[in-house]
């Protein structure tokens, strides 16, 4: 089950500050994410670890969790060496601690939103990231697109054996 383990520490407030060396950076290619191996598991990599492979990648602030900024970007895979490798995003289910899996899953959903809204739904023009908020702006008609929140609740109602 995906539940925010610490809602008081999670912030979706957009931060336009450029990426810093210690920021967590999740680079996605389709349904894969670049992770760093750590023993028998994987950890979310820092900018200093992935920048040598992708020095020109455009990364965007996704969210902040407990003073830890998480950035996201879309890349084409390259031959990686060392501890870095692309893994299926479903790996979020086995990452430890559980908060790492939660962070990866939220970042993946935002990454998919950016990747699937590269063009305007009104006129078809190319979009670009808004400089001060989490939005995409059409370069032709100026339409502003925000991520859609689709909450869901699953409930089971029981009455004994019925």
Where are these regions (language model features)?
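N-terminal alpha-helical interaction blocks
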Residues: 1-97
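Phosphate-interacting basic helix/loop segments used at nucleotide- and nucleic-acid interfaces
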Residues: 106
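Residues immediately within or flanking Cys/His clusters that coordinate Zn2+
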Residues: 114-117, 124, 135
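Short functional micro-motifs and their immediate structural scaffolds
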Residues: 125-128, 146
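N-terminal strand-loop-strand
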Residues: 132, 136-162
């Amino acid at each position: 089950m995906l539940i925010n383990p610490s809602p008081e520490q999670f912030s979706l407030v957009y931060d336009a500050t450029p990426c810093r060396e210690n920021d967590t950076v999740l680079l996605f290619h389709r349904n894969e994410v670049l992770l760093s191996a750590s023993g028998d598991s994987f950890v979310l990599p820092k900018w200093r670890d992935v920048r040598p492979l992708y020095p020109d990648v455009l990364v965007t602030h996704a969210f902040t969790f407990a003073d830890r900024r998480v950035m996201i970007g879309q890349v084409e895979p390259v031959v990686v060496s060392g501890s870095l490798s692309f893994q299926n995003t479903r790996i979020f289910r086995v990452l430890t601690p559980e908060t790492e899996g939660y962070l990866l899953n939220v970042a993946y959903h935002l990454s998919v939103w950016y990747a699937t809204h590269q063009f305007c739904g009104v006129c078809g023009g190319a979009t670009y990231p808004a400089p001060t908020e989490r939005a995409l702006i059409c370069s032709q008609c100026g339409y502003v697109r925000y991520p859609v929140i689709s909450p869901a609740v699953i409930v089971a109602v029981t009455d004994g054996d019925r």
